[in-house]
Amino acid sequence: MEFSTTLALFFTLSIFLVGAQAKVPVDDQFRVVNEGGYTDYSPIEYNPDVRGFVPFSDNFRLCFYNTTQNAYTLALRIGNRAQESTLRWVWEANRGSPVKENATLTFGEDGNLVLAEADGRVVWQTNTANKGVVGIKILENGNMVIYDSNGKFVWQSFDSPTDTLLVGQSLKLNGQNKLVSRLSPSVNANGPYSLVMEAKKLVLYYTTNKTPKPIGYYEYEFFTKIAQLQSMTFQAVEDADTTWGLHMEGVDSGSQFNVSTFLSRPKHNATLSFLRLESDGNIRVWSYSTLATSTAWDVTYTAFTNDNTDGNDECRIPEHCLGFGLCKKGQCNACPSDIGLLGWDETCKIPSLASCDPKTFHYFKIEGADSFMTKYNGGSTTTESACGDKCTRDCKCLGFFYNRKSSRCWLGYELKTLTKTGDTSLVAYVKAPNASKKSALAI
């Protein structure tokens, strides 16, 4: 027994010593200070200031960038400055936690990649210290990896997507299972939209501080019976000798076969493509050609279009009309109010209530109007008047939607974009203060 214990201790100590002896060679270590002039002046997504540095590959480069003064994000961009095409961002380390001038990015002999403020406060790190790391590099597919002496990845950027999936990158059940949109082109914080891998499908959600739970506004479903999705990967699949298709491919725990949904067939090299949940709530696939110049980028897939092929036009995106608006075929063309349909502009908003007391407000009705929430959320079965009573008793409810054919009711904690349908069995009710005029709007 004593011999076994001693032997086990010996092997444990040996493994520890081997790991401890593995260090990053001096020539592969670096310390970058966020200072000095800017490096990239080609057209750049979000119109930021950029400082690029090593490591980089032919098509990818690690950079500091900012869209507001003295607030920098550590990010990976794709594109080639020589082509004069737009450089785009495909991965970020510190969204929502920007660093200032003179911040540092350090890759030392212990193998940890650390982003810190000038005063030493750590903002982000890979937590790879003393794990046998010997190097860092960016692969041809845009995956930034930290690896050991056997070439095994100790850390990889593919495991922590933000709003983007590169070809070969996945959402995982036991890992990062969602993408989260950017708040806006100028503000790099988490936005209200997310693409989530659930047990049997991919779902687009809209979430704000007013919604009791995320509201689904689009779903990717699969015709194959699924037990539990383990992962969903953005893949480039060779269809023929000269054509490639872009798919989302899922691995199901209950089947030996993958499930797949086809997205697009780029005319360029499909392997330099990425799928992104945009700040506007749409999903787009961008494909890049290393041969083209200013036309290097193609949008090869868009989830919400205005071609009327599947009913999922841009009016189905919650904030397409910003604060409030009535939409048809992707166009925000009216601002509903209880004095009529007014012309829409960016100032359109829902009525403001001074009190939750039912005596102080009423509803105005919009016939033929639908909501982004009704298609993928079941609602409840009740009468039209009972639906209104529920909203009236709920101070957070801004209005409600009712389907007279199915007797389904949805309470609206965010109204945002309404869709004009022409179907009078669909009706929307909006709370308005009693100081304004009551009106029923037929559209």
From Swiss-Prot:
Keyword hit for Metal-binding: no
Location (main, coarse): secreted
CDD domains: B_lectin, PAN_AP_plant
Cysteines engaged in disulfide bonds, as pairs: C387-C409, C391-C397
GO molecular function per UniProt: carbohydrate binding
Keywords: Cell wall, Disulfide bond, Glycoprotein, Lectin, Secreted, Signal, WD repeat
Designated name of the protein: EP1-like glycoprotein 4
